[in-house]
Structures are given as C-alpha cells and as structure tokens.
Amino acid sequence: MLRQTVLQLAVQGRLARQEPWDEPAVKLVERIRKEKGQLVKDGKIGKTKLTPEIESEEIPYPIPKNWIWTRLDHITYISTGSTPSTSTKEYYIGGSIPWVTSSLTSQKLIFNADTKITEKAVEDCSLKIYPEGTLLVALYGQGKTRGQVSELGIPATINQACSAIVFWKANAPVKEYLKLVLTGNYEKIRSISAGGAQPNLNGDKIKRTLIPLPPLAEQHRIVARVDALMKLCDALEARLKERAAVQGRLVGSVVKEVVS
C-alpha cells in the first residue's frame, strides 16, 4: 500500500518539485515523434497506425501545466513476438538467440532465457530481436503475470504473450520514468483485460495506455525521489519482519513456560 501511494503521488506531480525553467513536456513529445517518423521512413522500425488522440473525458486527474497527457505508442514503438513451431527441430536445436516468454517478466531485469532459438526461426517466423533496454509488458500468463513490467538486459526475441516497448535516442531518457508509471499502474492495466477464465491484455490496450508525462528534468527528479522512498520502504519492511520474528520467538518462549 505504501509503495503504491508513493507511485501514485509521483505520477500526479506531487512528489518532486516543479521548476518554471524546465522545458515543457510538449517539446519533448514533439522531438520524440519527429525522430520516430524518421526511423519509420528509414525502415528502422515498422510503420504502425497511431492510436487516437486523447479525448478530454479520458483524462483521469489533473496534472501540472508543463506536463502533457500522451498515449504510450505516441512516444515509443510497441510490438510483440510469436512462438516458432515446436515441431520444427531446426528452430530450436543449436539455437543461441534468447526467446523470452511472459513467465520471465517477474524479473526486473532479464539476463537469460530458458529457451534459445536459431536464426532460421527468427527469419521464418519474422521475429524481431529487441535490443537491451527494451521494456516488456506481460499480456497474459499464470497468477500475477499479466501486467508485469520487466526490462531486457540482453538482446532477445519474445513470444506473443509480451508487448515490447522500444526506445531510441530521443525517448531513451524517459524509459525509467515510463517503467515507474507502468509499474504503478499494474492493477489498472490488469483491470482492462478481456476474456473469461484467463483474461488477456493485447497490444492495442498497451498502446492506448495514458501517460502523464512531465518535463524531462522533472522526470529525473521523480525517479530519484521514488528510488529513495522505495529504499525506505525496504528498510521499514525489514524492520517489521524482524519485529514479527522477535515477537514470534517471545510468544513461543511464553507458551513453553506455560506448558512445561
């Protein structure tokens, strides 16, 4: 609860100071979208249809005047992967390319994959090898998996149960803040899933995710502040566990005295 409160305050502009000389977030978005357009033109990322602009009734709460509401796919490139046929041995035997599934998104940083695939699998299945630093959002999976956010610590391919959020020069500095926003919206992201016994997210829902974007300088202040507060949460939780353990031993000693 305490961690969630910290994250909510952070994305509402109530955790770090606002400075009038910070470049407005709208300028940052303009640069990101311009560079994204050039990357599409150069064939470095795929051309995708942008989700609609944000309607006023979608905005959940007010933000500071030099912030901007944007959709996730307006400031990143979002794609997914697939599963090479397991009946085709050439896709797996001797493979060296990591293939990441949603089960690994419980890790904050992914440095290894349980399964490796071959270059033939990548080519035949039109898989993308996403660069180190790509964020992953689990679209579906067992238990708490759906909605989890992780980061690739290695270049890797992914399966269809993950959305990959890709960064480039202009938007790379916003990655840590976006990770914070997505992590803080874990329950909300899970709530927009569709389906019956095992609800699923999909790429379009991830693309449409609303992001309250501060100026870049303020993003850095927010991330630093959240990191410091999360360390305090870690220390508090450790103390509470220690106190509970001591109390448990004390109760055990009293019971032993009573029954002996």
Each language-model region and where it sits:
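Catalytic cores of nucleotide-enabled group-transfer and carboxylate-activating enzymes in metabolic
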Residues: I63-H74, E151, I165-L180, K188, ...
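A generic secondary-structure signal for well-formed alpha-helical elements
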Residues: V6-A10, R14, K36, V40, ...
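Extended, domain-scale alpha-helical bundle/helix-rich regions
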Residues: M1-E58
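Non-catalytic DNA-recognition/assembly elements of restriction-modification systems
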Residues: Q4-T5, R14-L15, E55-S82, R208, ...
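Specificity-determining recognition surfaces
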Residues: V181-I211
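A short beta-sheet element
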Residues: T101-S102, N112-D114, T118-T183, G195, ...
